[in-house]
Amino acid sequence: MNFRYNQTPFGYQRRKTREVKVGDVKVGGNNPIVIQSMINSDTTDTQGSVKQILELERAGCEIVRLTVPSQADADNLPSIRQELKKAGSKVPLVADIHFTPSVAMKAVEYVEKVRINPGNFADKKKFAVRDYTDLEYNQELERISEVFSPLVLRCKELGVSMRIGTNHGSLSDRIMNRYGDTPQGMVESALEFIRIAESLGYYDIIVSMKASNPQVMVQAYRMLASRFNELKMDYPLHLGVTEAGDGNDGRIKSAIGIGSLLEDGLGDTIRVSLTEDPVLEVPVAKLLADKFNKKISNLNSVKGYSEFRNPFSYNRFYSSEIKIVQFEAGENHPVRVETILPFENSNSFLENVAKLYQYGKSLSIEPESILVDSPLPDQLKEISEAATALSIPVGILLSKNVSLNEKLQKELLSFPKIVFDPFLQFQDGEKMLSFLKERQNAGLFSEIHTSGDKLDSLRGLPDTLSEIGIKNVLFSLDSKEILYDYRKLGSILSRFEFPILLHGSFSNPEEALYNSAIGIGGLLIDGIGDLIRISTSKIKDIEEIFQLSYDLLQGTRLRLTKTEYISCPSCGRTLFDLQETTARIKSRTGHLKGVKIAVMGCIVNGPGEMADADFGYVGAGPGKVHLYRGKEIVLKNVPSEIADEKLVQLIKDNGLWQDPSND
């Protein structure tokens, strides 16, 4: 299989795409990344829709989408256009179409772009299981062409662009039966429609591969880019994690998916889907886009590194086990979290640890490992004594200006793990190896931690360690280019079993949230990393960073430490107040660690985008809700006033309920 989906995974270069115009906005080519959002007003409500569109435009949104589910909605588009013209608005509009080709033919006359979902534009979801012969499959494609071609020709005639937007949760029965519920199925679904459009000489196309799981979403976009390379296609990509949710969780998932793809040079326009006021999506999208609009190509230091991943499938990078008393990491253990704390004296240190435990208790999480940040050598004895009061390992991060003399090496034998830079702390390589051997013989671990610009100098060290039998070593980096440099480290270590700790040091919690989600999150979804360690320079941020670390693991779906919510951002199809409903359900179920609950406004993507959710709450009509167990409806048309209670009872009936703690 050809794993190439971009110029290189080890440096930045934006993928070259054709330019597609959406009204006066240019997407792709050499243009900046374009920011989009979607209103959640009913499209038949002219004033409500216009108000939201203008608010988004003022916030910096460059393209606005609105749902057009019925003929009545399409008929109201001229009124919306007229009011926008009066207000002096020039923002291009996108009509979002599902199930209704006839409505698309009307809507195309009043918008700059049409979005169609290849999973339901010409197909009705029946969840039928059948094997298609090649002849039957081609007959299905001919049927689709008959339904889709009139819209393509009308778009071509009017100069209207189109997004062919695949959703992981709404693949057609035909695709599901041939390719399964997979990234490959998502890609082939879009390609079927692209080929039809191309056969009619239409190329003003933008493509998306959305999923609520960032891992699936990233794999699908990479596979699409790889297939585009094979087929000599250069269509721009619209990036988004659908149903990302709200608050920090929604922002983390979006940054993992969108940000890591932008790092790979993929993406020409983005939408951050939050279950919040649409205006609040824009600053998040701008933050992500600005980072990459300012980024210049950098392929200077990529030679000598080779791809060691399957970028289209999750496979954890295998490493040997780290075992310190009850602490276990690496091998098949969950990704662990290490917390950095300062040390002034025993009392303040133990007080900070106690606060961390207390905060962790409120999250139903216990701290797992502590690293003392750059203590003075004469503090080591006091730290060692304080650590005896704790049941978790306490390691030492050596200050860069500390030289590892023999006296200090002996004192460090009191600590289960130390972190040092081999290029700063040892002048003599033989002495370093002797030191590592001594620690291993004592059952202790050492973390080799250096800067990303020293990677070339690090290349021969794993071979040397293996040759002399040193195994109790893990590797980490201090880098501003977390994703690229850790991929380089992964390439160096791919023949070995040394564990990798993903380290990120940031100036404040907001920077930590976005950049750790992009860098560390982007690595985790590829199976790279056995531990993570995120820090800022301020002790007051410790609790926030502690929670961020576990939220990041939750966002990658690698470790669930709280209830997982999949909730759509709401649109004109939504049949209830989604933000209020989501908040209400969270208040009832937020203590159910590891349970996945989907809250969906309507049935368009609801059942499918619930993906691997355990339970679903999906709008079925005004004042009515369907409740799901997995993808199966178990209660239909439940009155919304009792739906919350019925959901709780459904969770209880399936043995996944536990009463909230009184702590």
From Swiss-Prot:
The keyword Iron applies. One of its GO terms (molecular function) is 4-hydroxy-3-methylbut-2-enyl-diphosphate synthase activity (flavodoxin). Converts 2C-methyl-D-erythritol 2,4-cyclodiphosphate (ME-2,4cPP) into 1-hydroxy-2-methyl-2-(E)-butenyl 4-diphosphate. Keywords: 4Fe-4S, Iron, Iron-sulfur, Isoprene biosynthesis, Metal-binding, Oxidoreductase. It comes from the Bacteria. Gene3D superfamilies: Dihydropteroate synthase-like (3.20.20.20), Sulfite Reductase Hemoprotein, domain 1 (3.30.413.10). GO terms for biological process: isopentenyl diphosphate biosynthetic process, methylerythritol 4-phosphate pathway; terpenoid biosynthetic process. It catalyses: (2E)-4-hydroxy-3-methylbut-2-enyl diphosphate + oxidized [flavodoxin] + H2O + 2 H(+) = 2-C-methyl-D-erythritol 2,4-cyclic diphosphate + reduced [flavodoxin]. Its cofactor is [4Fe-4S] cluster. Pathway: Isoprenoid biosynthesis; isopentenyl diphosphate biosynthesis via DXP pathway; isopentenyl diphosphate from 1-deoxy-D-xylulose 5-phosphate: step 5/6. It comes from Leptospira interrogans serogroup Icterohaemorrhagiae serovar Lai (strain 56601). Its EC number is 1.17.7.3. Belongs to the IspG family. This is 4-hydroxy-3-methylbut-2-en-1-yl diphosphate synthase (flavodoxin). Binds 1 [4Fe-4S] cluster.
